[in-house]
């Protein structure tokens, strides 16, 4: 991430893995707060690429409504791209997308090290 300098903004908006949650209501509030921040970036024409990592999981778990996601994405300026990641997108989300890619797991760092030692720079090898 050092390579990009001030051209990249990164926001970690959760507190760990959703399957280990201790407080579902707190997690839902974090997702909603994070979504409001994401929408501010989505609407800003200065940002050309917004990646919402694992947001599809948040939709599947009922933390945020998929219509809210679709409506928010539709607020983007013409040259802005929004990437949603996560497994199990609904047909409605898929139908609303310009591009859908299904990935096949070949190698993943979660298999090699404990979760507590992973950071984004470790995963990206930055």
Range-by-range predicted roles:
Residues 46-49, 78-83:
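Loop/turn-to-beta-strand initiation segments
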Residues 67-76, 92:
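Catalytic-core regions built around general acid/base machinery
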Residues 54-55:
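Walker B catalytic acidic pair
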Residues 116-122:
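Conserved small/polar residues in nucleotide/adenosyl-binding loops
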């Amino acid at each position: 991430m050092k390579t990009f300098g001030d051209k990249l903004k990164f926001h970690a908006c959760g507190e760990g893995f959703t399957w280990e949650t201790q407080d579902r209501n707190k997690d839902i509030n974090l997702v909603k707060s994070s979504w409001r921040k994401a929408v501010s970036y989505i609407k800003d024409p200065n940002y050309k690429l917004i990646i919402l990592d694992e947001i599809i999981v948040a939709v599947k778990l009922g933390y945020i409504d998929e219509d809210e996601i679709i409506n928010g994405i539709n607020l983007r300026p013409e040259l802005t791209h929004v990437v949603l990641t996560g497994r199990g997108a609904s047909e409605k989300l898929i139908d609303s997308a310009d591009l859908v890619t299904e990935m096949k797991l070949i190698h993943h760092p979660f298999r090699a090290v404990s979760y507590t030692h992973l950071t984004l720079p470790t995963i990206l090898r930055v």
